[in-house]
């Protein structure tokens, strides 16, 4: 009771049978006695080697689809990381405020907030490898950079990509997460799923 748990769902996973059925879970929730699951649909348009259905739908079609399941979707579309953080924070603040306004109600009709986050597939990775588009294509799924003993030519590209995350700022010389990073973790009462 009183909990809010965010659940991030990829658009490819969201169209599988069990997850597609779970969009109806809100019909069983009672905010007088239950917590709240905030679905976050991460829409990047591709699964293993195919486009996704949600990735081919317009924002209006998505809004109609989810409204039909009893959800009130909020949308964040991001291609710039800094703007994405700002827009996500602003939107999540609105959603949490709305959820808190629904608490204590036994029934809610077409008001269950959810979030649709749209980003390019493979965002922050290499844009192109061996003259093939990676970012924004199915090639970004699973293993975007192929490296073999016989063909190690992409190793410098992989190293550059991984170093772009600045692991030296996160880990000490022994490979452990630095104390100042560990100290950023929320206290148990502030962990996701333990909100009141």
Kindly label every feature range from the protein language model:
Residues 1-30:
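Cofactor-binding active-site loop characterized by glycine-rich and histidine/acidic residues
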Residues 13-17, 36-196:
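Conserved acidic/glycine
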Residues 29-32, 65:
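Short glycine/proline-enriched loop/turn "hinge" motifs that connect secondary-structure elements
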């Amino acid at each position: 009771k009183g909990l809010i748990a965010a659940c991030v769902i990829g658009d490819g996973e969201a169209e599988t049978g069990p997850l597609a059925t779970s969009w109806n879970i809100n019909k069983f929730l009672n905010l007088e006695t239950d917590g709240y699951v905030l679905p976050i649909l991460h829409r990047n348009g591709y699964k293993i080697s195919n486009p996704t259905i949600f990735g081919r739908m317009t924002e209006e079609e998505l809004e109609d689809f989810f409204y039909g399941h009893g959800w009130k979707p909020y949308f964040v579309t991001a291609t710039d990381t800094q703007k994405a953080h700002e827009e996500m924070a602003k939107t999540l603040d609105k959603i949490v405020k709305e959820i808190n306004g629904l608490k204590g109600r036994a029934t809610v009709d077409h008001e269950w907030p959810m979030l649709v986050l749209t980003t390019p597939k493979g965002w922050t990775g290499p844009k192109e490898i061996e003259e093939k588009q990676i970012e924004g294509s199915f090639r970004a799924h699973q293993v975007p950079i192929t490296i073999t003993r016989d063909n190690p030519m992409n190793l410098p590209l992989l190293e550059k990509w991984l170093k772009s995350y600045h692991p030296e700022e996160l880990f000490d010389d022994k490979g452990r997460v630095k104390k100042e990073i560990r100290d950023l973790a929320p206290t148990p009462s502030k962990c996701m799923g333990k909100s009141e």
